Amino acid sequence: MQLAKPLKYAAISGIVAFVGLMFGWVIFPAILKSQLKKEMALSKKTDVRKMWEKIPFALDFKIYLFNYTNAEDVQKGAVPIVKEVGPFYFEEWKEKVEVEENEGNDTINYKKIDVFLFKPELSGPGLTGEEVIVMPNIFMMAMALTVYREKPAMLNVAAKAINGIFDSPSDVFMRVKALDILFRGIIINCDRTEFAPKAACTTIKKEAPNGIVFEPNNQLRFSLFGVRNNSVDPHVVTVKRGVQNVMDVGRVVAIDGKTKMNVWRDSCNEYQGTDGTVFPPFLTHKDRLQSFSGDLCRSFKPWFQKKTSYNGIKTNRYVANIGDFANDPELQCYCDSPDKCPPKGLMDLYKCIKAPMFVSMPHYLEGDPELLKNVKGLNPNAKEHGIEIDFEPISGTPMVAKQRIQFNIQLLKSEKMDLLKDLPGTIVPLFWIEEGLSLNKTFVKMLKSQLFIPKRVVSVVCWCMISFGSLGVIAAVIFHFKGDIMHLAVAGDNSVSKIKPENDENKEVGVMGQNQEPAKVM
């Protein structure tokens, strides 16, 4: 028995609506997910791989120095007063070199190189980099603090070494041009014949701490970032490609061939998270991201804060901080023991970089209130000093990022050194940096064209199929049962119903149908 034409149309329309529903909510998401898994992996053919190897645009790198306005008083034990000078703006170009793949275990080995270009026109008003900054002598204080930690009985010898190398300084501060301490370098005179300074310089040359360049005539050149600029980092990083499992993309599995560090205690020695330049797709606000920082020898675990948007693209904002090592069980393994953790918001980097430095959020944001009491001139503000990253959740692409960190040092107080005996002994700020990313219009358009435009087109087509299919079913059903509907309507019109008046009089009222005489009222 063949179906009537209207029912055929209804069946076809129903199929169209069903196909639209299935394609829009089942088939297309599966296709998109499958395609994203291929595109987000670090295989040679993907655009993500090309951008991962060499970011095709510069990152914002801003440095803020703290100028000490009462250095002479601090030398006598006064609370330091600081004034922030900055930003000194640099373009930061990132590239990975000596890239080697291992398809068998789905990994890539690489080294990295960073290039910094100073842009005075984008720096703070009037800043040229030639400004003289008064700040603690980092090299001098590092020498004293290292001896204090490693061999405190040798502080007297360290005092003689400092006097010999720095020509009997009157205080622990240096007066230095901004670009000199940042990149160009300041000269450390190791051309000494006295025992203490000569022994100290020999040790320095042997251990070759970060930031040191060896010059002729026993001279050393020290800067904060000069050694890193346009130089290949010697460490070999191994990460997952994500071809076999896209959720592993960029995950650090080894550095210099070692699958764990030998720096901290227990689980803190594990490499957890990506290398910070790529993240897995399909993020939800419940996901806890992880990235590993080789500079700080630790992983960070940003958490979801709120939903945001960037250039019309919906994003999720994640935030992070340094943490409270004493009260967070996950972080206590960064301390020698739970009762020897630094104050909230501080991390001791000595074991990581072999230099007595502490890191915190800028202006001690979210740190122990005592840190702010020990320095005047700081004004922590979450908007200006917090760590935040806005991710496009489907692809896991960072759209906007502000990674901020402050470096601090202790003004060591010690009776064994005349230069240190009156210092306040507190931890004070040196400088803070902001590494920023804002995906430019070119790559925003690329993301939209590859991800969101197809999604919207498919969504519109599917809704049209569902709408027209549903309307087609309704119309076909109505058309098919049109005769029955009309018959019922006619039958209803030809019927007479009696209505009983409100009073009990013997009256009848008829309702007039077709070809019927008017009813009489009795």
Curated annotation (Swiss-Prot):
InterPro entries: CD36_fam (IPR002159). Residues 513-522 have a biased composition (Polar residues). It is found in: Cell membrane. This is Sensory neuron membrane protein 1. One of its GO terms (biological process) is sensory perception of smell. The chain crosses the membrane at residues 12-32, 459-479. Principal component of the olfactory cilia membrane. Detected in both male and female antennae but not present in leg, abdomen, thorax or head. It is a multi-pass membrane protein. Belongs to the CD36 family. Residues 1-11, 480-522 are cytoplasmic. Residues 33-458 are extracellular. GO terms for cellular component: cytoplasm; plasma membrane. The gene is SNMP1. Residues 500-522 are annotated as: Disordered. Plays an olfactory role that is not restricted to pheromone sensitivity. Keywords: Cell membrane, Disulfide bond, Glycoprotein, Membrane, Olfaction, Receptor, Sensory transduction, Transmembrane, Transmembrane helix. GO terms for molecular function: scavenger receptor activity. Glycans are attached at N67, N105, N229, N440.
